[in-house]
Structure formats: C-alpha cells, structure tokens
Regions:
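N-terminal, membrane-interfacial amphipathic/helix-forming hydrophobic leader that caps
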Residues: 1-108, 251-262
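Alpha-helical membrane-protein architecture signal
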Residues: 28, 32, 116, 160-168, ...
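Functionally important transmembrane alpha-helices
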Residues: 48, 54, 197-212, 216-262
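Hydrophobic core segments of transmembrane alpha-helices in multi-pass, intramembrane catalytic enzymes
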Residues: 86-89, 165-168, 221-229
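Solvent-exposed interhelical
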Residues: 187-200
Length: 262
C-alpha cells in the first residue's frame, strides 16, 4: 500500500479528520426544461378539468359537443368537479417530471411544514395586501369580488353545491396552482440564471395569466398576491406555507361571498 493510500485510510478512521465526500449536484430542471414541463403540467391540469366535464356529459347521455359542454360546465356542481379533477392530473404530471430527474418529490417541491411564526407572518402580510386592495376598490367604487364569481357562488349555494365549490376553490385549486407556480416553476427557475427574484416574478406572472377571466384591476391584485406567495416560498423554503395561505385567502373570499354578502 502506498503512503498516500495509507494516509487516506488513516484519515477515514480518524473522527477528527473525516473523509471528503463530494455532494452530488441537485437534479433540477433548469430554465427551458422547467418552462417546457410547465406547459405540459398546465396542459395536464386543463385536460383533467375538461375530461371531468366530458365525463359528466357522457353520464347524462347528452351529445358530446360544444353546446353540451358549455351547458353542463356552467352548472356550479359540474364546475366544482372540474376544478377538483385538475388536481390529480397536475400532481401526476409534476410527479412524472420530477421522477425523470430521479429527484425526491418532497425535496423538489419543498413540501416541508412551516413554523407557526412563518405562518403568522405570511398570514399578516396577506391580510394587509387584501385589505389594501379592498380599500382601493371601495374608494374607486369597484366591486370587491368579480361579478361572475359572486353569481357562481350564490348559485352554488342555492343549488346545494356550496360544499363542492368550497372544496374546489379552497383546497383543490390552491394545491394545483401552488404545486405548479411556487412548487415546480419556482424550484427550477430559481436554480437557473433567473435566480430567486426572477423566479418569483416570472412564476407570479404566469400564475396571473391562469386568471385571465378577471379584468386588469383584479389581475394586478392577483399578481401582487403572487409576489407575496413567492417571497414566502423563498423565505420559509416551504410550499405548504403558500398552499395554506392560498387556501385561507380563497376560503375567506368564498365564505364571505356565498353566505355573508356580495
């Protein structure tokens, strides 16, 4: 045995001089890989939602055409089912993308539970943002909630679909959107040339695009909330934190609109 090999062996047995171990680079999709997979994941979410409506049309034995899809999809219970079915489709696509990289699903998405201090800080910041937009809306004489959402939620309440809508908008939608935006997109883009600030801004912009059913005013509000969620994702290294914040925001909006006012 050579002196160098003998020295290395002695170091490996010495607790004061542990052997040097190279840490493998994390297996992460970078900018373009994350972007392309992001499109695929969004498409999977869309297919899951549309597939749910097609299934309901088929069960009702209606012709599977645009008119039937619009008619069935306009019902509150059907829409709630559609939004809910987007979640498993999203999770499956994200799991596949991460699996190909042979990375840990939990580590890749930072599925770690935050501390109560982080949860409180995130909630207080979210409340301040929402209250600021609410105050601005009232000063401008604007509605605090888009009219079509108010009509949908109240219709769901009257048609006994309140709990389905509550689950869809307060659980399924926040999980789907956060796994895509602050989970998969943020993780890959923050490890690319965009770094953390660019990843927060770009993922927030794309999350805003998902809400194009709103007007520019409400889109600006969505974008500002997205920036806060992105910052909290970075600050806490916890996707569960942004999922909970997103769920609380939607839950409050749904309950206030559906039962306590317009």
């Amino acid at each position: 045995m050579s002196l160098s090999n003998e020295s290395a062996l002695m170091d490996s047995l010495n607790p004061d001089h542990p052997p040097l171990i190279e840490t493998p680079a994390p297996r992460v999709w970078k900018f373009w890989g994350t972007a392309l997979w992001g499109i695929a994941i969004f498409a999977a979410m869309f297919v899951g939602q549309i597939g749910a409506i097609v299934y309901l049309v088929w069960v009702a034995r209606d012709p599977i055409d645009l008119a039937s899809l619009q008619h069935v999809g306009g019902e509150p219970a059907s829409l709630a089912f559609s939004v809910t079915m987007g979640l498993p489709a999203t999770l499956a696509a994200v799991w596949l993308a991460i699996r190909i990289k042979k990375a840990s699903f939990v580590d890749y998405l930072a599925l770690y539970w935050p501390s109560w201090k982080q949860l409180l800080f995130g909630a207080v910041g979210l409340i301040l943002i929402v209250v600021a937009w609410e105050t601005m809306s009232r000063s401008l004489g604007r509605e605090a909630t888009p009219g079509f959402m108010t009509d949908l939620l109240k219709s769901g309440r009257d048609k006994d679909a309140a709990l389905m809508l509550l689950f869809a908008f307060s659980v399924a939608a926040p999980m789907s959107e956060e796994v895509l935006a602050r989970g998969f997109l943020y993780r890959g883009w923050s490890a690319s040339f965009l770094r953390v600030p660019g990843a927060i801004i770009l993922s927030s912009l794309l999350w805003t695009v998902v809400h194009l059913q709103y007007d520019l005013y409400f889109l600006a509000e969505v974008f500002s909330i997205g920036l806060w969620f992105g910052y909290m994702r970075y600050r806490s290294n916890s996707l569960w934190l942004t999922i909970v914040l997103h769920a609380l925001n939607n839950l409050t909006a749904v309950v206030l609109t559906m039962w306590l006012g317009s």
